[in-house]
Amino acid sequence: MSTVAPPADQAADVLKKLSLDSKSRTLEIPEPTKKTGVYQYGAMDSNGQVPSFDRSLSPMLPSDALDPSVFYVPNVYQQPYYYGYGSDYTGYTNSESVDMTSGAYGENASLVYPQGYGYAAFPYSPATSPAPQLGGDGQLYGAQQYQYPFPLTASSGPFASSVPASTQSKLSTNKAANSASAGIPKGMNGSAPVKPLNQSALYGNSALGGGLAAGYQDPRYSYDGFYTPVSWHDGSNFSDVQRSVSGSGVASSYSKANNNVPATRNQNSSSNSHYTSMYQPASMTGYAAQGYYDRVSPNKSYGQYGSTVRSGMGYGSSGYGSRTNERGWLNTDNKYRSRGRGNSYFYGNENIDGLNELNRGPRAKGTKATEEVSSEEVKKQTFDESNTEETVTCVLPDREECNRDDFPVEYKDAKFFIIKSYSEDDVHKSIKYNVWASTPNGNKKLDAAYQEAQQKSSGCPVFLFFSVNASGQFIGLAEMKGPVDFNKNIEYWQQDKWTGSFPLKWHILKDVPNSLLKHITLEYNENKPVTNSRDTQEVKLEQGLKVVKIFKEHNSKTCILDDFSFYEARQKTILEKKAKQQQSQKQVWEGKTNDEKPGTVDSTM
């Protein structure tokens, strides 16, 4: 058994075997670089803490991800602009006079990336982005103060706005109608301050029903009381202001001014949840000055889940409000009208009063006028034309007399033209008064054709195929019976811009769908179908005879005569409306004339 060395000797042994280097080495450990986390609305520190949501901050996007021709939205969802939705980008400015016309950012004018799910529209390009905003006048607008939309998911507690109203506007309230809604006790007259419409401060007990909470501005009406052109909902339409929508989508978190019990949010899942992000503080300076959320991308641009695909694709009442037609402008004159698509409540391009152009009458929905109008009931009417009174004879044609079986369909020589009317109201008046008027160029074209036809000894009638824009059908065949009188203006057209007139006679009155005529192409119109023609488009003899034959042989169950009483009532209402407008304009003009008389002193000086 070997002896064990003492511990002191063992320690000395170990020390001898150790080899020491001449240079000391330090352990090199790379220090971790602090990486800034990317957050949707700004920067996030290394601890994962998200900074407070501040409106003064700008979004942080990586520099290599920016393209001068691309507009990057906060939620990174990019939507194309070329789907035909450019009509929602209208020429308006916000309260800071920043142009909001163009839907294109940067150099590429064919693309724009509007917001995707649930975000309001932006009037500015991102503050840190080099992409300039291209205005409608061709000017480039630099980065402005960035404005964030309200978050989609609202807080559980009551929302208190930190944005003060820009102006303390006051509206005089009606003691009978407005005193109660403004929180003023009955019997008191005066004015009440208008509160801004904040997020989720919508309506009473449901999303769109029961009226607004007291003291808040109704977003469906502009500051002057007119119905707003912007449709704020994409679901079922409502035909009355006080009518509620079934199934509350977003309840108000505000307590009414005359109620101490605050309303609670609806915790149930609803497809209308994206409404919360579209309502933001609004002042009473008018819709043209309410900022970025109304005119650029109104809520009607978004579908049920916030995408840019409209429900109904623009047709039917699901895409537009039942009181408006697409933009739904309330026009005070007849010269400039919106030519939008119709909805299920009206029959065509109607406005709030329902008196704009109709491309089809009630018969298009399978209903006919309940009252039949006879020729005796159509009385003579007198119109003031160039300070001379002229009596116009109105004769209602008989249906069988117009659609005669012996009407010839073969002609050795004849001229044919397509007439595109803006409304059936004008066609109704043409049938009633046996007269028509086209555009200045159209009148010249038709008059030249008629003068040329009259010089032919063998006879050459000039036929007109009538169709209303966007109606999908032709409605009749008429013949010119005289030259165009360029100095004779008729006042009973739907619009006041038509000048000149010429007499005609109606031969066929029936609804002929375009599907029966699409196979006929026109050499004068790049071989396009006859159904794709402009006003006063000339048709060659061969194609014209084919159209006449189809008109005669088609067995139609409806024609414009079915809606004659309907258009008679509309004409009366339109004339009354025009008379009131003229009277109002006359009063305004007389007031201006009195103010401009010598000797009057301006009170503002």
Swiss-Prot record:
Q: Any idea which GO molecular function terms this record carries?
A: RNA binding
User: What is the species listed in this Swiss-Prot or TrEMBL entry?
Assistant: Arabidopsis thaliana (Mouse-ear cress)
All copies of the YTH domain together span: 414-551
User: One GO CC term of this entry?
Assistant: cytoplasm
UniProt-annotated location(s): Cytoplasm
Under which name does UniProt file this protein?
A: YTH domain-containing protein ECT4
Q: What happens when the gene is disrupted?
A: No visible phenotype under normal growth conditions, but the delayed leaf emergence and leaf morphology defect of the double mutant ect2 and ect3 is enhanced in the triple mutant ect2, ect3 and ect4.
Q: Which UniProt keywords apply?
A: Cytoplasm, RNA-binding
* Expression by tissue: Expressed in the shoot apex, at the sites of leaf formation, and in emerging leaves.
Q: Which of this chain's residues are annotated to bind RNA?
A: 420-422, 426, 436-437, 469, 493, 498, 506
Read off the PROSITE patterns from this record: YTH
Question: Which Pfam families does the UniProt entry name for this protein?
Answer: YTH (PF04146)
UniProt xrefs under InterPro entries: YTH_domain, YTH_prot
Basic and acidic residues bias: where? 368-383
* Biased amino acid composition, Polar residues: 256-274
- Stretches for region Disordered: 249-274, 357-384, 580-605
